[in-house]
């Protein structure tokens, strides 16, 4: 495993404007595109463009570098995604907020309800790496500003993530805006998320 062959990638939802090159992928977002299901906001948005590949491997890691220097409008975002269907997916990205800060966060959607976790980072950050790792039906999302030093963002379980899964990249602009997201260094590797070696599961009582 290593650099992902572009022929392995397929549009789950294709944008109007994009470029596929050997060393980079560009997606130009369209206004009013988003991914969210029900929680708090009570709307269901499911029209963001998605470029994904499929695997039945139960242990792997996928990493990608994102460049969102063209993003200047609230909620503009691009990042890593694992989209199984409209009710079951996860994503991680930086969402632009204003000239002072933006949101580095992840959304996990299980059985039709989205769960958002974020932290503020400076608006001056214009690139971010993400790494998605799978261990059976559990998943970890990490981020990095240099592609070398990684920080855990989230560990989660996917209710429908047991078999073959689709994963890749996405970009969207939920409000009235558009920008060009640039993706590079798409890599697939053996799982970098090692098995837990600390506290063991609770023992089940003997009947």
Provide a role label for each language-model segment.
Residues 1-207:
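Extracellular glycan-recognition regions
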């Amino acid at each position: 495993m290593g650099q992902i062959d572009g022929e392995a990638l397929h549009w789950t939802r294709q944008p109007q404007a994009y470029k596929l090159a050997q060393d980079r992928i560009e997606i130009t977002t369209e206004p009013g595109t988003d991914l969210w299901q029900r929680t708090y906001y009570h709307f269901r948005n499911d029209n963001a463009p998605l470029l994904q590949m499929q695997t039945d491997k139960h242990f792997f890691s996928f990493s990608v570098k994102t460049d969102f220097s063209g993003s200047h409008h609230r909620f503009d975002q691009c990042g890593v995604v694992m989209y199984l269907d409209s009710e079951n997916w996860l994503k991680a990205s930086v969402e632009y907020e204003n000239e002072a800060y933006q949101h580095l966060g992840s959304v996990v959607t299980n059985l039709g309800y989205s769960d958002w976790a974020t932290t503020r980072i400076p608006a001056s950050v214009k690139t971010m790496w993400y790494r998605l790792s799978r261990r059976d039906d559990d998943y970890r999302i990490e981020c990095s500003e240099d592609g070398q030093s990684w920080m855990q963002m989230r560990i989660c379980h996917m209710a429908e993530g047991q078999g073959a899964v689709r994963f890749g990249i996405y970009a969207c602009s939920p409000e009235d805006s558009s920008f060009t997201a640039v993706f590079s260094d798409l890599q697939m590797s053996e799982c970098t998320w090692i098995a837990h070696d600390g506290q063991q599961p609770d023992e089940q009582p003997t009947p």
